[in-house]
């Protein structure tokens, strides 16, 4: 196993950490509550810096954005939405019936309708919604 393999293993261990604050499990980006945009964008920047440094990316191949799931937005009366200059997107609309008890079975909530984040040319984002 060479250095690259060990580095790759370290990146995956970091990313798939079962800790509730691990990158795949944290809900900090989804439910900002009373957080100010500035504070959430500082956390976003730190996360991007960490991801890029852990992946040893060159300056011309840096990850520039983050798509966040596992953070139902209908609870905040929102659908797919972004912050940090359109670089961080929250895409979980709470479509799972598991969230039924949270809305007394209100599956017709306009923020739970099917929606897709379309990304074209690497950075052009458009939300496509069910009518």
Short names for language-model regions:
Residues 1-131:
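Feature recognizes metal-dependent phosphohydrolase scaffolds
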């Amino acid at each position: 196993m060479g250095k690259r393999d060990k580095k790759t293993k370290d990146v995956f261990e970091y990313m798939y950490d079962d800790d509730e604050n691990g990158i795949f499990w944290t809900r900090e980006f989804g439910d900002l509550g009373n957080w100010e945009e500035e504070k959430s964008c500082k956390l976003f920047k730190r996360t991007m810096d960490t991801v890029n440094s852990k992946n040893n990316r060159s300056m011309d191949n840096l990850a520039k954005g983050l798509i966040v799931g596992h953070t139902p937005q209908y609870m905040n009366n929102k659908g797919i939405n972004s912050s940090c200059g359109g670089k961080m997107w929250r895409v979980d609309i709470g479509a799972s019936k598991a969230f039924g008890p949270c809305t007394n079975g209100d599956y017709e909530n306009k923020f739970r309708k099917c929606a897709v984040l379309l990304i074209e040319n690497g950075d052009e984002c458009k939300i496509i919604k069910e009518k």
